[in-house]
């Protein structure tokens, strides 16, 4: 039955650009809340000066994200993608709104109690991240590379746009009373609205787009059970005729999929170990004082986010897209030369060199991530693609977790670090 979907090119292409826009917004929604917190870290450093906010909050976030994605990936074949993603986006919406409530309730004052509450909300962000990222990448692995790239591009847009808005709000509120707090609250209010929009788009718009229906019906014909609820939301109730041939629905186990893609998984892990060992903690606490003053860390974060966005779109240029697995591995390992480069630049270099290094870090992070996530699912059946997408997200979040932990090593030998 799967063969009937191979020749429906007109239907397959209908709604493609609308789907790309929707997936871009969903990618934006999957990171806007967390990026808003990272980008407004200067506010949290003012409120909680003794608690290393950018490092501690990231370290709180990651164990919950990593633990949740491991559990969800193990049960991915029995979990409704629709319920999973909706729960994730709703959790993002509630958690972001709670940050505003927490700040208003404490009147922007610091202390151990408010910081504990902040950490609890950040832990909820971690759970939402694992729920959404694994679910979305598993679902997108069923589809064409352009939709995967659009979602990942949206994730980078979240970083670039929040950085741009942070620079604008800092300039606008810098001389006003409680300017940092006003800017941070504005960010969180915007993030809450975007998360709510993401819930609406995923629930009511995405399931009815023809190209999305095409790929989900194709996955169902190959034995995927995770798409049933999404197809039902599109008005396709009876799936018995789409998966009636069990001989065609046999799939590789998770162990076999991981063995065949171990280089992709390890490369994703290494990409994010390198990136998160530098960004954002090192940029906020280890780059010293320069002519840009309080703007310096914000400019560095903005440059990283902007070039990460550029890097996620460069694979669209055919001769820049890396599909050779050995070349990807070489490129990933080469990024580790950036670590000593950052160390010596922070110690001896000026701000121009640091901005250049941050740009390279962002560009390579975005480019290599998209290359891996778009080529890995090729050649597999729907259920296998969904499982592989979840497995890759485990290694991606594992790399982030390890990178965040290693980021603390930059504090060794620093006066008054703890």
From Swiss-Prot:
Conditions for induction: By nitrogen deficiency and 5-fluorouracil plus methotrexate.
GO CC list: plasma membrane
Tissue: Expressed in leaves and siliques.
One GO molecular-function entry: nucleoside transmembrane transporter activity
Keyword terms of this UniProt record: Cell membrane, Membrane, Transmembrane, Transmembrane helix, Transport
One Pfam family linked to the record: Nucleoside_tran
Localization terms from the record: Cell membrane
Membrane topology: Multi-pass membrane protein
Transmembrane segments: 19-39, 56-76, 86-106, 112-132, 142-162, 186-206, 264-284, 291-311, 326-346, 353-373, 392-412
Disulfide bonds: none
One GO process term, biological-process aspect: nucleoside transport
Role summary: Nucleoside transporter that can mediate uptake of adenosine, uridine, guanosine or cytidine when expressed in a heterologous system (yeast).
Family (UniProt): Belongs to the SLC29A/ENT transporter (TC 2.A.57) family.
Name of the protein this chain belongs to: Equilibrative nucleotide transporter 6
Lineage, uppermost ranks: Eukaryota, Viridiplantae, Streptophyta, Embryophyta, Tracheophyta
This protein's encoding gene: ENT6
């Amino acid at each position: 039955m799967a063969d009937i979907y191979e020749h429906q090119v007109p239907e397959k292409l209908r709604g493609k650009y609308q789907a790309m826009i929707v997936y871009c917004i969903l990618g934006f929604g999957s990171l806007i809340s967390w990026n808003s917190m990272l980008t407004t870290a200067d506010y949290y450093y003012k409120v909680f000066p003794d608690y290393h906010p950018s490092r501690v909050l990231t370290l709180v976030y990651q164990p919950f994200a990593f633990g949740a994605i491991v559990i969800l990936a193990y049960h991915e074949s029995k979990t409704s993608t629709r319920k999973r993603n909706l729960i994730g986006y709703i959790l993002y919406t509630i958690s972001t709104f709670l940050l505003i409530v927490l700040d208003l309730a404490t009147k922007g004052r610091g202390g151990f109690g408010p910081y504990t509450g902040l950490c609890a909300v950040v832990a909820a962000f971690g759970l939402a991240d694992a729920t959404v990222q694994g679910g979305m990448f598993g679902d997108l692995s069923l589809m064409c590379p352009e939709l995967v790239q659009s979602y990942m591009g949206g994730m980078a847009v979240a970083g670039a746009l929040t950085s741009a808005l942070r620079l604008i709000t800092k300039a606008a509120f810098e001389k006003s009373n409680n300017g940092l707090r006003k800017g941070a609250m504005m960010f969180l209010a915007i993030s809450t609205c975007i998360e709510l929009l993401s819930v609406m788009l995923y629930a009511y718009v995405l399931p009815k787009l023809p190209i999305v229906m095409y790929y989900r019906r194709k996955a169902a014909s190959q034995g995927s059970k995770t798409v049933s609820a999404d197809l039902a939301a599109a008005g396709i109730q009876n799936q018995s005729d789409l998966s009636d041939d069990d001989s065609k629905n046999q799939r590789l186990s998770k162990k076999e999929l991981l063995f065949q893609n171990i280089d992709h998984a390890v490369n994703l892990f290494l990409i994010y170990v390198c990136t998160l060992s530098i960004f954002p903690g090192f940029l906020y606490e280890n780059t010293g004082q320069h002519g840009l003053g309080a703007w310096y860390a914000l400019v560095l974060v903005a440059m990283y986010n902007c070039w990460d966005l550029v890097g996620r779109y460069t694979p669209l240029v055919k001769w820049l897209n890396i599909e050779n697995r050995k070349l990807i591995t070489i490129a990933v390992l080469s990024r580790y030369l950036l670590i000593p480069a950052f160390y010596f630049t922070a110690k001896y270099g000026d701000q121009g060199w640091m901005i250049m290094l941050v740009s390279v870090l962002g560009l390579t992070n975005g480019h290599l991530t998209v290359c891996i996530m778009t080529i890995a699912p090729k050649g597999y059946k729907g259920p296998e693609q969904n499982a592989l997408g979840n497995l890759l997200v485990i290694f991606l979040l594992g790399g982030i977790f390890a990178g965040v932990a290693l980021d603390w090593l930059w504090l060794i030998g620093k006066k008054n670090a703890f």
